[in-house]
Amino acid sequence: MPQLDTSTWFINIVSMILTLFIVFQLKISKHSYPMHPEAKTTKMAKRLTPWESKWTKIYSPLSLPQQ
C-alpha cells in the first residue's frame, strides 16, 4: 500500500492562507466608507396609550424590602 505524500501540503496551505489574506485586504481597501458618519434623526409620532395616562408602578422583586 503506497504512502500518502504530504511533502507539498505545507506550501499549499501557506500559499492558500496568503492568497486569502491578500484577497480580503484588497476587498476591504476597495470598500468606500462614509467620510463623516452622522446619527440619523428619526421623528416618531407620540402616541398616547391607555396605560400612559394612568399612574402605575411596577415593583421589582429585588427592590422590595427584606422580610
Swiss-Prot record:
InterPro entries: ATP8_mammal, ATP8_metazoa. GO terms for biological process: proton motive force-driven ATP synthesis. Keywords: Acetylation, ATP synthesis, CF(0), Hydrogen ion transport, Ion transport, Membrane, Mitochondrion, Transmembrane, Transmembrane helix, Transport. The modification N6-succinyllysine is found at residue 54. The modification N6-acetyllysine is found at residues 54, 57. GO terms for molecular function: proton transmembrane transporter activity. PANTHER family: ATP SYNTHASE PROTEIN 8. Subunit 8, of the mitochondrial membrane ATP synthase complex (F(1)F(0) ATP synthase or Complex V) that produces ATP from ADP in the presence of a proton gradient across the membrane which is generated by electron transport complexes of the respiratory chain. ATP synthase complex consist of a soluble F(1) head domain - the catalytic core - and a membrane F(1) domain - the membrane proton channel. These two domains are linked by a central stalk rotating inside the F(1) region and a stationary peripheral stalk. This is ATP synthase F(0) complex subunit 8. It comes from Equus asinus. The lineage of its organism: Eukaryota, Metazoa, Chordata, Craniata, Vertebrata.
